[in-house]
Amino acid sequence: MTDALIRLEQVAVTLSGQSVLDNIQLSVKPGEIVTLIGPNGAGKTTLVRAVLGLLKPDSGTVWRKPKLRVGYMPQKLHVDQTLPLSVLRFLRLVPGVDRMAAESALEEVGAEKVIDSPIQGISGGEMQRVLLARALLRKPELLVLDEPVQGVDVAGQAELYGLITRLRDRHQCGVLMVSHDLHLVMSTTDQVVCLNRHVCCSGHPEHVSHDPAFVELFGKNAQSLAIYHHHHDHAHDLHGAVVNDAPATSSHTHTHVHGDHCKHG
């Protein structure tokens, strides 16, 4: 798997004496979209932090391609309502970014009209596009998107997932995405990893949606809806740090597998 951008092998994390992640195996290749799904408390945010290098696993390894450029899009941005901050000034917090670079990134995500708007005054969908534009400013080889459609209506969610696919196609970057809605990402993602502190099952989304481990986690409606209700319990500051954090179509083919700790066939 030398062509991987990032690879996790037997990763385990314990926080406050409790196992949060156990024996995680995961990799993302260039041009591949991998989606993490799982209930609240499944360890998705912890896994993302391990991928970003913000948290060191207690055991196992996190291998990254040397000098890997990563663009990160947090779930939610916490901005003081009294802070005079335009979208342009927010994007220019990224070192080396001028107005031209900011405009170019916003055009890529279809949000160029908000460049001079106060960041507190834009809509939820516009905010997600601005956060995505900020991730693109780093010219990433790997995009890490933590709930990229958070706070967006269903129509807007489908548009954003389509945009993510187009960006993947254009830049041939790998994408690691956390999502709560397998139904909407069915045509976007190449591989789904169902997480509940360990990898319950993984593979093509259509296969995972019928897997007993997936159905057990998400209930009897899982096969038709593949959805659960996400309760967002934390936000991020301007630099992506967690505030009050709690402990496509593609030619890629994947084998549908179960995690080591699953009791499903």
Curated annotation (Swiss-Prot):
UniProt key word Cell inner membrane: yes
Coiled coil: none
Top-rank EC class of the record's enzyme: translocase
Protein's cellular compartments: Cell inner membrane
Membrane spanning residue stretches: none
MF annotations from Gene Ontology: ABC-type zinc transporter activity; ATP binding; ATP hydrolysis activity
Keyword Lipid metabolism: no
Region (Disordered): 245-265
Listed PROSITE patterns: ABC_TRANSPORTER_1, ABC_TRANSPORTER_2, ZNUC
Chief subcellular location: membrane
Residues reported to bind ATP: G38, P39, N40, G41, A42, G43, K44, T45
Catalysed reactions listed for this entry: Zn(2+)(out) + ATP(in) + H2O(in) = Zn(2+)(in) + ADP(in) + phosphate(in) + H(+)(in)
One GO BP annotation of this record: response to zinc ion
Top-rank taxon, per record: Bacteria
Pfam family, any one: ABC_tran
InterPro entries: AAA+_ATPase, ABC_transporter-like_ATP-bd, ABC_transporter-like_CS, Metal_Ion_Import_ABC, P-loop_NTPase
Cellular component terms per the entry's GO annotation: plasma membrane
Entries under PANTHER family matching the protein: METAL TRANSPORT SYSTEM ATP-BINDING PROTEIN TM_0124-RELATED, ZINC IMPORT ATP-BINDING PROTEIN ZNUC
Function: Part of the ABC transporter complex ZnuABC involved in zinc import. Responsible for energy coupling to the transport system.
Stated family: Belongs to the ABC transporter superfamily. Zinc importer (TC 3.A.1.15.5) family.
Protein's name according to its UniProt entry: Zinc import ATP-binding protein ZnuC
Organism: Pseudomonas savastanoi pv. phaseolicola (strain 1448A / Race 6)
Higher taxonomy: Bacteria, Pseudomonadati, Pseudomonadota, Gammaproteobacteria, Pseudomonadales
Recorded name of the encoding gene: znuC
